[in-house]
Every structure is written in C-alpha cells, then in structure tokens.
C-alpha cells in the first residue's frame, strides 16, 4: 500500500489527480443505440469454437482508432479464415419474461420476479433473454450460449482526424460518427458446458427485414428536429471562474434549497490540471438539454412507469401539499439501525449481516421491510473493511476499480455464507485493475469502459491479485502470451488468442520476493512450482460465476431501482452503479450529495405497449462508476433524506476518507438506472482452492 506523505508538493499533485472524470468515464466509444433500435429479427453467423479465448479482431484494450479500420466485420472475419459453421435467427423483443422462469434463483429468490427482455425463435417461442450493454451494443443469452456484440459505427467526415478520445457530448450525442442499428462491429460467442468447460468463438449479426417498408431508422442521426427545440436554462461561458462557480452557470436561478452536503473550499485548480481539463470538457461546454430530455427530467425515470403517468414540465415550487421529492420523508422516531461494527481483521461484520438476512423472508422485500440503515463497511459507521481506498490517478479506470472492489467484497461475503462462522479475514490485496486495463478487448483502457464488460472478463478469463500485475494507471502492454488462431493459415494473426498464463519473460521479477504472509489468498492459490506461482496460472485467478444488471437487463429496474438495489445489496454484498457527477462532486467533503435541477440528460428508449405500460425505464447519461455498500437516512434542515453509501476511487484524501453519501430513491443523476451485481465462482481457480482449504482448516 502506498504511504501517505504530507507535503505541499504531494497535496498539490493530489488535488490535481483526484478530480479526473472523463478519464473515469463510462461512455467510451462514439456510439449510441437504444432498446427500440434493436427490436426485430436478427441473423447470427457463428464460427467454430475452441477452449481458447479470442479477441475476435479487437485490440487490447479496444481502441476507436483501430475499430474504424474494420469497415465490414463479416468480410473481416472471412478474410482472416474465420469461416461460419452455423446460422441462427432470433427475434429481439420488448416483451418481458420473469427472471425466475429462465434462470435459477433458488438462492436468490428476490430476483425471481424481475422482468427481463425476451428473445424468441422464429416460431415465437421464448428461447432466452437479452439486454443492451448500456448504449454500445447488446448481449443475448440462449441456454448455455452467450452472444455479446458492440454495434458498428463509423466516422461521417464532419470532424477532424479519428482519435481514441470520447466524442460524445454531454447529451450522449455526436456530430462526428454514425451508429448502425442493423449490424455489429465485434461479436464474441461463449459457450458454458458441463464441468465448467468454456468454449469461445466469434459471430457476425445483422438485422433481417421481411419487406422494404421495415427498412427505416437504421442509423442514428447527429441532428434531429428535437435538438432545435431547447429551453435555455443556463449560459455557455466557459471561463475558469464561471466553471468554478458551477452552480451559477449550470443550474436554475432562484434555487433556494439549502445544500445537503459540505464542500472543500481550498481546492487549488491549475490551468493545466486534470481538474480544469475535465470540468471544461464535461461542464464548461455543457449543451442545453433537448426538449424531450427536459420533459423526462421532471420524473424519476425517462420513461413513464404506468399508464396514468404523464410528463410534467413544471418544476414543483413547494407550494402544494405534495412533498417536494419522494425522498423527503417525515422524521420517524422508530428508525431501526442494523449497522454492524465488527472487527475488520475478521469477517465478524459480514457474518452478522448474513445472520440478519437469515431472519428475513427469502422473497423480495419491500423498502419498509428492509433495515433503515445498513452497510457492508464505511467510515461513518466506523467499520470500513480496509483503510486504503484505490486512487485511479490519471486514468479512466473507475469502471474497473469499482467492479473489482465489489467483486472482492462479494468473495468475502460469499465465503462467510458458505462457512457460516467467524474467522480471520486474510484477503488483504486487491484484485488486479491493471489486468483488465491492459488485457480487456471489450473496454477502452484508460479512456473508459463498462463494469458489465469487466465482469464478463472476470467470468471468462479470471482476475489475479494486484501483486501479480500491479496497477500503474497506464495502458501497459498486456503480458499474456499471444498466439495465432489455428485457422489463421495465412499468418496474419489479426485475430489473436489469449493463453491463460502470463509470459514468463514479462517484467514480474520485481515481485518474485513477495512476503506471502501478507497475501494469504496468493498462498492458498499458488501451486508448488515457483514458476506457476509467479505466472498467472489457473489456480491464481478469481472467477465470476454470474453477473448482470440488477433487474436482469439494462433499464429493467421495475420502476423501483431503489428497492431492487437494496434487496441485492442486503442479500449478497456491495454492487456497482454509475451516475453523472456534477462539478460540485469534485469538492464533496461530507453530507448527502444532491444538486437540485442539475441538467442531467436521459431518454426514454422504448415505445409504450398498447396499455401504455413501459417495461424499460430508459437511458441515463452517466460519467462515473462507484461502489454502493449500503444506505441510511439523515436529517438535514429539518427533513429526513434517504441516501446511498458509496465508495469512490479517488483515494482516501477525497470525501469522507474516500467515501460519500448520495441521494437515494429519486434516481438522482441516473444513480438507480444501471447498477450491477457479480457473483464469485468457487468451483474453479483460486476460489475453489481457497474454499477447500478453509473448509479443511475450520473443520467444515
């Protein structure tokens, strides 16, 4: 762990480093696709599968500059000897099925009633489920097969040279690229057979149209009529002084609500700092919201949640008998506080939380049935699991740091549930952020990515501990061996295979003299061979068994993201969520983070059914991923606010020792629109070895 050095130069550097944002963005490729754009029949062409994990043509990490060179993915696969061996036609629908009717929810009954998007065969039989991957692509699950794709997009010639920087504006639009809704850029096929055998291949997919009248809205448009109808609610001055005075620039005048959180008042912003650069990019040139987005911003979600709900363009002035916000509730003297204060050197807190869940019904609980206050560890309750909070530095790795911390804590929670007793907790090294940063072909490295795709890599490839590939906050070359695909007869090797072991020539010698007493999980996972210990073999990798959006698909939060997220946290441990951070968030110190009337972009991404009911609650613009560990309630200015407890990735010097509280129950800045869960796998890799060892030692 890095030492804390309290010097003037260190503090100046820290102030510049802590506030990076687009380099922690979770919107990375210049694409935007919505659920309604993908509905209909798709033809999937599949290649052969093998035990080797393949990039299917992507670079590591995935790069925009590399992607645009592939203008025809189907042709690209064929030219690289990836012949198609089978074909499948599916129908992506906006109908829903119950999660419990498709997936095993025996140990997670709270998920059984989730409503997820259905996949049909050509005879209109339900064969699986699907989701958009935020707004970049989609994933289809049919039995033991998973098809993940990023949508095709290309520059339209209206802008300068192609770069790897994010080309989306603050409303999720771009003037520089066009997204295709009818074909994909990359497709990865994964098959999970019995006995944990995983096979991998590639696929190409394109929309099928039965008649010419169906061929419409194939591509996104950079300008539409709606963009001409905007409400000018803030100015465009991008001078630094106005950026620092962000409330005056961005939010409605006349906002008399007292602040719900405190800020630092001594932040030193240098012109060439990451803080200045980020604020200029995300907030100094923030565009006005389109009229449809302004309509959507007046309700909890972008889409109406029932047939009677209508869009309300009038801001509540507080002059009615109705509450100003559904999150402002009357003070209740009968609050139940179940926060635990266990010893951080043991699993005591996790065990007490687990025992508390055993006394509650297994079904999904209503909010009033859940504890008023609950946490898996935070500084306000003085029970943080560990002191050091990851500092992502000058790299947009928040999507990795957050998901891997949640994964680590869920490993600990799951071990407690399996062993059901108190024991010393030896998991004192974080999972390797750098492995995902350098080696993922789904995400864009320091330019950002999605926690959903981090989880996918954890399931398919496994993640070693940080000690084996330490975090450098740079896009180091992935140290995995790369070999040609067996079908690559012409030697081009454009489609690369990943072997599940680090190159013996990689720069690991510095770490060969590890004190294993300080990395107990490494000891449990290691084999006798020194070479195997310091090469990332199967036994040294932590696998995910399952992962998904909370609710079963993107935007499928049942019009009550608060409830389903609370249930998931309560049962299984921390989750990851994303939101759009305003400039005020950079200087957060304490309290409940909430900025009234912050112009947050969102869209309804689905058409209503005949009965006016929307199954999807829409797309929210987000730019930061964080961990949610619990929740609580706090009285501020005579009102009781509900909040989430979050863990950031900007080090201990930010916020409350690296943690923060954010408004709960109102989907503030999209916080309740796209959360994720991940489940550890104890049937293979390091998880299997550790569980068996601990069961033996504890006599289970």
From Swiss-Prot:
Which cofactors are named for this entry? Answer: chloride
Active-site positions, per UniProt? 398, 624, 648
The reaction(s) annotated as catalysed by this protein in its Swiss-Prot or TrEMBL entry are: Release of an N-terminal dipeptide, Xaa-Yaa-|-Zaa-, except when Xaa is Arg or Lys, or Yaa or Zaa is Pro
Record-annotated residues binding chloride? 450, 452, 549
The signal peptide annotation in the UniProt record is 1-27
Q: Where in the cell is it found?
A: Vacuole lumen; Parasitophorous vacuole lumen
- Which residue ranges make up the pro-region? 210-369
- The EC number(s) attached to this protein equal 3.4.14.1
CC annotations in GO: extracellular space; food vacuole; lysosome; symbiont-containing vacuole; vacuolar lumen
Q: Name one GO biological process term.
A: proteolysis involved in protein catabolic process
Q: Which residues form a coiled coil?
A: none
According to the record, how does pH govern the activity?
Answer: Optimum pH is 6-6.5.
GO MF annotation list: cysteine-type endopeptidase activity; dipeptidyl-peptidase activity
Q: Give me the glycosylation sites of this protein.
A: 52, 144, 265, 337, 373, 481, 490, 507, 615, 667
Record-annotated disulphide pairs: 395-446, 439-478
Keyword annotations: Chloride, Disulfide bond, Glycoprotein, Hydrolase, Protease, Signal, Sulfation, Thiol protease, Vacuole, Zymogen
**Cofactor annotation remark:** Binds 1 Cl(-) ion per heavy chain.
Q: Does the keyword Glycoprotein apply?
A: yes
InterPro entries attached here? Answer: CatC (IPR039412), CathepsinC_exc (IPR014882), CathepsinC_exc_dom_sf (IPR036496), Papain-like_cys_pep_sf (IPR038765), Pept_asp_AS (IPR025661), Pept_his_AS (IPR025660), Peptidase_C1A (IPR013128), Peptidase_C1A_C (IPR000668)
Q: What CDD domains does the database record attribute to this sequence? A: Peptidase_C1A_CathepsinC
Q: How does it assemble?
A: Monomer.
Q: Which PANTHER family is this protein grouped with?
A: CYSTEINE PROTEASE FAMILY C1-RELATED (PTHR12411)
Functionally, this protein is described as follows:
Thiol protease that cleaves dipeptides from the N-terminus of protein substrates. Active against a broad range of dipeptide substrates composed of both polar and hydrophobic amino acids. Proline cannot occupy the P1 position and arginine or lysine cannot occupy the P2 position of the substrate. Involved in host hemoglobin degradation by generating dipeptides from hemoglobin-derived oligopeptides.
Family per UniProt?
Answer: Belongs to the peptidase C1 family.
Instruction: Write the protein's name.
Output: Dipeptidyl aminopeptidase 1
Source organism of the structure: Plasmodium falciparum (isolate 3D7)
